Swiss-Prot record:
PROSITE patterns: TOPRIM
Name used for this protein in its record: Ribonuclease M5
Oligomer status and interactors: Requires ribosomal protein L18 (rplR) for catalysis; it can be replaced by 30% dimethylsulfoxide suggesting L18 functions as an rRNA folding chaperone.
Summary of the function given for this chain in its UniProt record: Required for correct processing of both the 5' and 3' ends of 5S rRNA precursor. Cleaves both sides of a double-stranded region yielding mature 5S rRNA in one step. Releases 5'-phosphoryl and 3'-hydroxy termini.
CDD domains according to UniProt: TOPRIM_RNase_M5_like
Activity across pH: Optimum pH is 7-8.5 at 37 degrees Celsius.
Superkingdom of the organism of origin: Bacteria
Phenotype of the disrupted gene, per the record: Not essential. Accumulation of precursor forms of 5S rRNA in total, ribosomes and polysome RNA preparations; smaller forms (126 and 135 nucleotides) are predominantly found in ribosomes and polysomes. Each of the 10 rrn operons gives rise to a different 5S rRNA precursor due to differences in their 3' ends.
Gene giving rise to this polypeptide: rnmV
Cofactor(s), by name: Mg(2+); Mn(2+); Ca(2+)
Keyword tags: Cytoplasm, Endonuclease, Hydrolase, Magnesium, Metal-binding, Nuclease, Ribosome biogenesis, RNA-binding, rRNA processing, rRNA-binding
Organism of origin: Bacillus subtilis (strain 168)
Length: 186
């Protein structure tokens, strides 16, 4: 599988794993304190070939994603679910631990960042669905993010991410229905 865009990852182990999965070029941020010259590289890549951000599904990875998104508008985003980024017998989480199939799958389901449009998914919808506040909210948001391929967000950021990736209410409701059915079957 050949990827036209340049994939932004956190480090060289991530690059090695990406190259096992797909034919692609990468830019490494080397941590969450991203140097200006790396941002400049990403800007140039965005202008010439496009950029896909694929960071670890953890707090530092989300911080890197946000930093790049703010500095370089219009990037595409690929999200790797947490459970697919865990090593088999060690601690930690990251792209470098994901299977080749998982990496390919998340790169086939990229979302393009767009100007946030008013959404027909309201904050009340999120509260009513038990995605904000309540004992199961975090688990529900995590599973919803996996199903919609938008990654995990906290309650405050969920509506913004749904708007940014222009998730349709019908897709949201379908994914939410799946989350609720899975919850009942546990």
């Amino acid at each position: 599988m050949k990827i036209k865009e340049i994939i932004v990852v956190e480090g060289r182990d991530d690059t090695a794993r990406i190259k096992l999965a797909v034919d692609a070029d990468t830019i490494e941020t080397n941590g969450s304190a991203i140097d200006d010259h790396v941002i400049d590289q990403i800007r140039l890549a965005q202008k010439t070939r496009g950029v896909i951000i694929l960071t670890d599904p953890d707090f530092p990875g989300e911080k890197i994603r946000k930093t790049i998104s703010e500095a370089v508008p219009g990037c595409k985003h690929a999200f790797l679910p947490k459970h697919l980024a865990k090593p088999k017998n060690k601690r930690g989480i990251g792209v470098e631990h994901a299977s080749v199939e998982s990496i390919r799958a998340c790169l086939e389901n990229v979302h393009e960042e767009m100007e946030a449009q008013p959404s027909d998914i309201s904050a009340e919808d999120l509260i009513h669905a038990g995605l904000i506040g309540g004992p199961a909210a975090k688990c529900r948001r995590e599973r919803l993010g996996d199903l919609l391929k938008i990654g995990y967000t906290n309650g405050k950021q969920l509506q913004k991410r749904l708007q940014m990736f222009q998730i349709k209410k019908s897709d949201f409701m379908s994914a939410l229905d799946t989350v609720m059915r899975e919850e009942q079957n546990e």
